[in-house]
């Protein structure tokens, strides 16, 4: 029988620290509800002291989600803990996650302290957090570079103080897998009261070893893994939930498993990618669009004869179903509903109507609609519900002439038209839009990515727009890359809450 590994998802906290990946409270609740359906054990919902928005997100997620434990991060500061406890007051299951740096770099350089004072502070904050909640997790920040004997001393002290989980982070992604695993084993073998707490992994991917280090920790006794959807996270990212879960499913001899419903992995991956404007690289393990693609003739021959020759995971196990019904412009609603149900979506009538309309528009431009197309169509629903600015009409002239664009924007219940030239079709269209808004904005970054294959398939555009001291991100998807670019630009303008420029009277 397999031992239980608890999954601690920090997509909404560590994952959201990535520039441009900030979510509003409504979006965070949407992700949290999907994480609940996915079967995660703990959701780290935010860092309440950091901002009113984070505080409110933790509070609202506590009301919206009932099965997982809701966790709030703090520093080793009593005020942080007070605020976190307040944000968690409505949670059915609650945890405070507090801690302090334990490596020489943190003790001496960052904190200007001593090893003895760090132990005292660690014990003090754990005891203080226990006044509010029974479930207290202690993080030994930068444990990857800490002296292992000192680390064991800190861990023993905080467990004695009441910590129920001890988190051993490789904060900088420094460790080799054998080094990280050895640290976990040392704690298991040398901390007398280690049986009173769960050891947790929290690995960063700076050297590309986050998942390997996490698995090494699990093999040596850790029974909680801190992960994010798609491995999203600060700098080079965190351990990927999907990689840990599916590795354990493939290697049943490890005899450790999770409660994750793996058939929702693809849906979760696309939701997070869409809401956070963070495209998944095509060759990403498990959820990349090439993860189950076979181009070599030898590989294709083997897969056609027996999938297991080159596939160790059944695509259906992560919710990526093979098409039984080919969706085209002639497909009816029943076929679309069936396909969406296989992908894990249960839409309201209003959402289905919006999706079907967009589906038909896309199907008119493509021969067949694939699963990845549907995932992005559904992901667009919430963004399309409330549009203060929308594109009514666009015409672009390019080629050997000076690129010229004419756009018609809809502001509420009326329309405005503008024409401009530029260095290319996108530049011309952006210039035309700028004439119609009341803010001076700069298109600072532009990224285009193909969602599926083929010259007539969907392209996804991500932009970064600056307005004074504010920076926002937007995205758009369309078979017409110029149209996708404009939709992305308008998405960013909506985030800035720009309004219509008032025409000056003569």
Functional labels for PLM-detected ranges:
Residues 175, 182-305:
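Catalytic alpha/beta core domains of metabolic enzymes, predominantly
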Residues 471-473, 477-505:
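Mixed-charge, glycine-accented linear interaction segment located at domain edges/termini
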Residues 5-7, 17-42, 56-64, 78-199, ...:
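Alpha/beta enzyme core
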Residues 4-5, 11, 246, 252-419, ...:
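A mid-to-C-terminal "edge-of-domain" accessory segment
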Residues 1-77, 324-331, 337-339, 343, ...:
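N-terminal capping/small domains of soluble enzymes
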Residues 170-171, 226-234, 249-258, 319-325, ...:
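Short beta-alpha connecting loops at secondary-structure transitions
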Residues 14, 18-19, 47-52, 103-105, ...:
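Short, small-residue-enriched loops and turns at beta-alpha junctions
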């Amino acid at each position: 029988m397999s031992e239980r590994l608890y999954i601690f998802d920090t997509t909404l906290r560590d994952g959201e620290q990535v520039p441009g990946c900030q979510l509003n409270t409504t979006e965070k609740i949407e992700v949290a509800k999907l994480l609940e359906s996915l079967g995660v054990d703990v959701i780290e919902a935010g860092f309440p002291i950091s901002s009113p928005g984070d505080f409110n997100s933790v509070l609202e997620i506590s009301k919206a989600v009932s099965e997982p434990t809701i966790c709030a991060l703090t520093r080793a500061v009593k005020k942080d803990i007070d605020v976190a406890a307040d944000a968690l007051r409505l949670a059915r299951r609650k945890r405070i996650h507090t801690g302090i740096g334990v490596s020489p770099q943190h003790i001496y350089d960052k904190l200007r302290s001593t090893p003895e004072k760090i132990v005292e502070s660690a014990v003090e904050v754990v005891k203080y957090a226990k006044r509010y909640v029974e479930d207290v997790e202690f993080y030994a920040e930068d444990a990857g570079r800490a002296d292992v004997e000192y680390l064991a001393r800190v861990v023993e002290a905080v467990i004695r103080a009441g910590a129920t989980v001890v988190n051993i982070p490789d904060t900088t992604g420094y460790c080799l897998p054998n080094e990280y695993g050895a640290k976990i084993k040392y704690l298991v073998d040398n901390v007398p009261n280690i049986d009173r707490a769960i050891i947790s992994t929290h690995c960063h991917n700076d050297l590309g070893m986050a998942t390997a280090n996490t698995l090494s920790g699990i093999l040596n006794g850790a029974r909680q893994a801190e992960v994010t959807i798609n491995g999203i996270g600060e700098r080079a990212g965190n351990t990927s939930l999907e990689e840990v879960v599916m590795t354990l499913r493939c290697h049943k001899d490890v005899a450790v498993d999770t409660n994750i419903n793996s058939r929702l992995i693809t849906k979760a991956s696309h939701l997070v990618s869409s809401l956070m404007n963070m495209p998944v690289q095509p060759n990403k393990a498990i959820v990349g669009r090439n993860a189950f693609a076979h181009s070599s003739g030898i590989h294709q021959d083997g897969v056609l004869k027996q999938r297991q020759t080159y596939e160790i995971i059944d695509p259906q196990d992560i919710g990526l179903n093979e098409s039984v019904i080919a969706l085209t412009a002639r497909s009816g609603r029943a076929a679309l509903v069936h396909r969406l149900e296989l992908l894990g979506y249960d839409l309201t009538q209003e959402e289905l109507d919006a999706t079907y309309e967009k589906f038909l528009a896309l199907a008119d431009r493509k021969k067949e609609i694939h699963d990845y197309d549907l995932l992005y169509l559904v992901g667009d629903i919430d963004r399309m519900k409330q549009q203060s600015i929308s594109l009514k009409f666009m015409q672009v002239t390019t080629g050997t002439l000076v690129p010229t664009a004419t756009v018609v924007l809809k502001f509420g219940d009326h329309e405005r038209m503008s024409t401009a030239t530029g260095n290319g079709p996108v530049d011309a269209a952006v210039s035309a839009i700028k004439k119609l808004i009341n803010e001076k904005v700069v298109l600072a970054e532009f990224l285009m990515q193909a969602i599926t294959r083929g010259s007539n398939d969907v392209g996804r555009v991500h932009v970064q727009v600056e307005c004074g001291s504010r920076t926002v991100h937007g995205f758009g998807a369309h078979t017409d890359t110029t149209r996708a670019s404009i939709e992305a630009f308008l998405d960013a303008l909506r985030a800035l809450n720009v309004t219509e420029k008032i025409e000056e009277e003569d």
